[in-house]
Amino acid sequence: MADVADEELGFDNIDTVVGISINGIAFAYEVARILESDMTVFRTTDEGEGSGSLSNKYSQVAGKRVVIIDDVLSSGKTMSKTIQSIRAAGGEVSLAIVLVNKTTRNEIDDVPLRGLIRAVAV
């Protein structure tokens, strides 16, 4: 995932990595470590798909160039909510990376979307 971020943006153009809870956090931690960048978390809630908020216990995203990391993209609702939350907090979302993209989408809310694996029905 860090290699994808480097190929798409270059290490110097990434300030903060955002991991979507729960499964995206471990991937985001490793990407942030490799990139030597800050990290924060988008915490999902039980209120329904796509609900959640940015954690205030980690790095802030205001004025930062952000890469979002998650494990699986299915409907894209949680990723869209994450993008909206980062933008509302003053961050610039440059790229979204997932381990498995279960859609045919290559962007989401005008943000490039990259998946290490694409799994769609044929």
Language-model features: where?
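Conserved acidic residues
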Residues: 15, 64, 94
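Short glycine-rich phosphate-binding loop at a beta-alpha junction
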Residues: 11-21
